[in-house]
From Swiss-Prot:
Organism: Neisseria meningitidis serogroup B (strain ATCC BAA-335 / MC58)
Stored InterPro entries: MinE, MinE_sf
UniProt entry keywords in alphabetical sequence: Cell cycle, Cell division
Family classification: Belongs to the MinE family.
UniProt protein name: Cell division topological specificity factor
Keyword rRNA-binding applies: no
HAMAP family given in the database record: MinE
Record function comment: Prevents the cell division inhibition by proteins MinC and MinD at internal division sites while permitting inhibition at polar sites. This ensures cell division at the proper site by restricting the formation of a division septum at the midpoint of the long axis of the cell.
Gene Ontology BP term (one): division septum site selection
One of the Pfam families matching this protein, by short name: MinE
């Protein structure tokens, strides 16, 4: 062991770091199964604000739903757009 390795330690290989991070993510997802993500209400609100900023649409015409399909969370966004005026 060289003096530099002793003082600063060895760097972990990127594959090891990536594996450790993935294991943490998987453990968190398993712990949260059956729960809606805590960011979902904020995400819904912000999506509605952005959509209403760029498209003249009523908030009543925007539907956001979250469900599980095949073990994955699916966020579905349905917007009823107003008809465009023909020139």
């Amino acid at each position: 062991m060289s003096l530099i390795e002793f003082l600063f330690g060895r760097k972990q290989k990127t594959a090891t770091v990536a594996r450790d991070r993935l294991q943490i993510i998987i453990a968190q997802e398993r712990a949260q199964e059956g729960q809606a993500p805590d960011y979902l209400p904020t995400l819904r609100k912000e999506l509605m604000e952005v959509l209403s900023k760029y498209v003249n649409v009523s908030l009543d015409n925007i539907r956001i739903s979250q469900e599980k399909q095949d073990g994955m969370d699916v966020l579905e966004l349905n917007i009823t757009l107003p008809e465009q005026k023909k020139v």
